């Protein structure tokens, strides 16, 4: 039997094609097997591809699964933006809140219609603070990134943080150093197995752009992504990290900032992050961004 699927290529965290972070999206994924989804993700070769399935439960509107070229992951920020952008276009949605089932739980997504286009706001998963990377593991990490201890920001612990898909937070002093990073991907992959975390988010806090607080780069070679252009599940946890370690300035229990990523690889995009704070601790993280359709096609399978 011939099966036809709606296939999109969408750039997230940008309004300009060929920038931001590209994601594949299949909006009518019912009937696809795990094997087929993995093959499709490998063929498209984006850092993630999102597959939208019909809801089978009144608690959520859609079930979304995310695959890198090599494996399934619980959730993905830019592919969530892409998936719900495509879904909003197909269904001509008005401003609304929808819920999607993911590997990180059932989470809300806000679809904001403005000027005949959409902005997507993703509420991320449970905030979790993991291990601090120190000692021999820290030495291995610095060697893998080809940076020195003197490059690190003081009082910024190297720590695993998650809002659904964990990342190692690594603060460095210089934007110039950030843009020149040339990691040893093989060593990073091996270290991931030891620390049980696949992504490394190296960031600089800068005042060079008055509108941008964070510039970053994210490496995840252990799951087939040497460098991810713009990463929702790195900047979201970073917001929680900055609040938790009292490195953030905010008013009225809301910490907001913008992060720019992808500059070093020619795919820059901007993420807006909002952290709700209660009793000086982060309790909820949202990320938001724009998107643009690069192409729409039809995938035909027998």
Swiss-Prot record:
Keywords from the UniProt entry: Isomerase
UniProt family annotation: Belongs to the PhzF family.
Protein name per Swiss-Prot or TrEMBL: Uncharacterized isomerase CA_C3446
TM helices/strands, residue ranges: none
GO molecular function, one term: isomerase activity
GO cellular component: cytoplasm
EC annotation from Swiss-Prot or TrEMBL: 5.1.-.-
Active site feature: 48
Top-level EC class as recorded in UniProt: isomerase
Annotated SUPFAM superfamilies: Diaminopimelate epimerase-like (SSF54506)
Isomerase keyword on record: yes
InterPro entries in UniProt: Phenazine_PhzF-like
NCBIfam families linked: PhzF_family, PRK10281.1
The keyword Isomerase is assigned to this record: yes
Biological process terms in GO annotation: biosynthetic process
């Amino acid at each position: 039997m011939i099966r036809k699927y709606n296939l999109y290529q969408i750039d997230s965290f940008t309004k300009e094609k060929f920038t931001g972070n590209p994601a594949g999206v299949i909006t009518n994924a019912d009937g696809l097997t795990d094997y087929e989804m993995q093959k499709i993700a490998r063929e498209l070769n984006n850092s993630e591809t999102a597959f939208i399935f019909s809801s089978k439960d009144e608690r959520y509107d859609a079930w979304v699964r995310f695959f890198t070229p090599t494996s399934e992951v619980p959730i993905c920020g830019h592919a969530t933006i892409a998936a719900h952008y495509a879904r909003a276009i197909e269904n001509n949605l008005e401003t609304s809140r929808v819920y999607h089932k993911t590997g990180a739980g059932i989470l809300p997504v806000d679809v904001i219609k403005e000027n005949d286009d959409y902005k997507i706001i993703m509420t991320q998963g449970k905030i979790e603070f993991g291990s601090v990377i120190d000692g021999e593991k820290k030495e291995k990490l610095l060697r893998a990134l080809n940076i020195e201890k003197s490059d690190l920001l003081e009082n910024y612990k190297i720590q695993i943080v998650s809002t659904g898909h964990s990342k190692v937070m690594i603060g460095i002093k210089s934007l110039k150093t950030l843009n020149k990073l040339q990691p040893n991907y093989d060593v990073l992959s091996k270290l991931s197995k030891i620390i049980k975390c696949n992504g490394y988010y190296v960031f600089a806090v800068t005042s060079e752009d008055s509108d941008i607080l964070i510039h970053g780069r994210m490496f995840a070679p252990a799951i087939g992504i040497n460098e991810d252009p713009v990463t929702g599940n790195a900047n979201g946890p970073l917001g929680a990290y900055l609040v938790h370690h009292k490195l953030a300035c905010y008013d009225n229990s809301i910490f907001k900032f913008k992060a720019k990523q992808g500059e070093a690889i020619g795919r820059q995009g901007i993420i807006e992050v909002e952290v709700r704070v209660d009793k000086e601790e982060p309790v909820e993280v949202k990320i938001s961004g724009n998107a643009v359709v690069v192409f729409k096609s039809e995938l035909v399978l027998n």
